[in-house]
């Protein structure tokens, strides 16, 4: 369902993202096929995606086994990085005293999205922060893009966002599904 449980008629994709009109995401997911949509997530290390079980609900983030904040941050970081996914690590390179490489995580990048598609998505997500459901994440003198997400009865609440230098994902909820009052 749409975030506000209302139908708004035809609209731009930017407005659909900005106002969490999830029926638009559902329709696009059906057009590109769930198999294609899920393949992008799998390329970015979403390890618990079951294409056969999560087929249609995947358009709205409804996955049988859920996703982690690390997986979500990696997905959004790929958008911030012009479509290039980089596996999260706190160590990129270690070289010993004799200049021998001990650990090298610098060449693990993989292109997931076209640069132009990533930049268009960033523009849409920028609108979410400027004047949509994510205005609380707007930072003065910084370019921030992101998306809010809320499950039915606010059992889970998400914000995933990024700037030029940082990507973050915030999840609020309980270990066992329980409504959080006063959350929007």
Spell out what each predicted region is.
Residues 2-48, 52-81, 126-127:
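Active-site-adjacent helix/loop patches that line small-molecule binding or acyl-intermediate pockets
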Residues 15, 66-184:
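A penicillin-recognizing enzyme superfamily signal
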């Amino acid at each position: 369902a749409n975030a506000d449980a209302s139908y708004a008629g035809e609209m731009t994709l930017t407005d659909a993202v900005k106002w969490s009109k999830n029926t638009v995401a559902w329709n696009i997911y059906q057009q590109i096929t769930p198999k294609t949509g899920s393949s992008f997530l799998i390329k970015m290390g979403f390890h618990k995606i079951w294409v056969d079980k999560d087929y249609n609900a995947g358009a709205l983030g409804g996955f049988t086994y859920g996703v982690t904040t690390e997986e979500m941050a990696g997905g959004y970081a790929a958008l911030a990085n012009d479509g290039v996914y980089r596996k999260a690590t706190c160590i990129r390179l270690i070289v010993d005293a004799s200049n021998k490489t001990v650990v090298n995580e610098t060449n693990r990048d993989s292109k997931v999205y076209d640069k132009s598609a990533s930049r268009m998505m960033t523009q849409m997500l920028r609108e979410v922060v400027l004047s949509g459901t994510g205005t609380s994440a707007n930072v003065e003198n910084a370019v921030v893009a992101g998306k809010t997400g809320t499950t039915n009865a606010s059992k889970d609440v998400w914000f995933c966002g990024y700037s030029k230098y940082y990507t973050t994902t915030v999840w609020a909820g309980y270990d066992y599904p329980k409504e959080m009052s006063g959350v929007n």
